[in-house]
From Swiss-Prot:
Key words of the record: Ribonucleoprotein, Ribosomal protein, RNA-binding, rRNA-binding
Function: One of the primary rRNA binding proteins, this protein initially binds near the 5'-end of the 23S rRNA. It is important during the early stages of 50S assembly. It makes multiple contacts with different domains of the 23S rRNA in the assembled 50S subunit and ribosome. Forms part of the polypeptide exit tunnel.
Entries under SUPFAM superfamilies matching the protein: Ribosomal protein L4
Protein name: Large ribosomal subunit protein uL4
Single GO term (MF): rRNA binding
Organism for this UniProt entry: Staphylococcus aureus (strain NCTC 8325 / PS 47)
High-level lineage: Bacteria, Bacillati, Bacillota, Bacilli, Bacillales
NCBIfam families linked: rplD_bact (TIGR03953)
Gene: rplD
Length: 207
């Protein structure tokens, strides 16, 4: 069990928390991390690429010239692939690039990503974000007080509209919940700021 300071939003220490080594202290599995990142990136692809084959190209209903007697090669339609403006053979069609990964591997990838951040001193635990209203300037000051880098992933226990709206216009800052935590967001961020309640919830799910 690793011991972490729990900070207030003004940067002072309010207590400490013990985080499970099974979630935040394992040896990161790079191959599983790589596979999980590829899976998420594949799922983000639109897959809307398309071309027209010979059945989709307009025109070409009439035989361009008679079968025999012209001395030229026989042709059935001007929309065959060898013609300019003809259909494409074996071209791309709309498809989904998403694929699935076993649950145990997904959880191992998450534990690996969290452990990597912890080992790189990229994990900060705060007591809570108590914003009564969305305040972008105030939120930016909090991150500055906590000495956070430009790319930060903020993790709350549940959806917090005030936190989300406060961080929305700050470049490089992303907000998610403990339930919505994913490998791509963790690895893209330079630092992870997680509330005490969210850390416990992550341990419950992944521990």
């Amino acid at each position: 069990m690793a011991n972490y300071d729990v900070l207030k939003l003004d940067g002072t220490k309010s207590g400490s928390i013990e985080l499970s080594d099974a979630v935040f202290g394992i040896e990161p599995n790079n191959s599983v991390l790589f596979e999980a990142i590829n899976l998420q990136r594949a799922s983000l692809r639109q897959g809307t690429h398309a071309v027209k084959n010979r059945s989709a190209v307009s025109g070409g209903g009439r035989k361009p010239w008679k079968q025999k007697g012209t001395g030229r090669a026989r042709q059935g339609t001007i929309r065959a692939p060898q013609w300019r403006g003809g259909g494409i053979v074996f071209g791309p069609t709309p498809r989904s690039y998403a694929y699935k990964m076993p649950k145990k591997m997904r959880r191992l990838a998450l534990r690996s990503a969290l452990s990597f951040k912890a080992q790189e001193n990229g994990l900060t635990v705060v007591d809570a974000f108590n914003f009564e209203a969305p305040k972008t300037k105030e939120f930016k000051n909090v991150l500055s007080t906590l000495e956070q880098p430009k790319k930060v992933l903020v993790v709350t226990e549940n959806e917090d509209v005030n936190v989300e709206l406060s961080a929305r216009n700050i470049p490089g800052v992303q907000v998610t919940t403990a339930q919505g935590l994913n490998v791509l967001d963790i690895t893209n961020a330079d630092s992870l700021v997680i509330t005490e309640a969210a850390a416990k919830k992550v341990e419950e799910v992944l521990g």
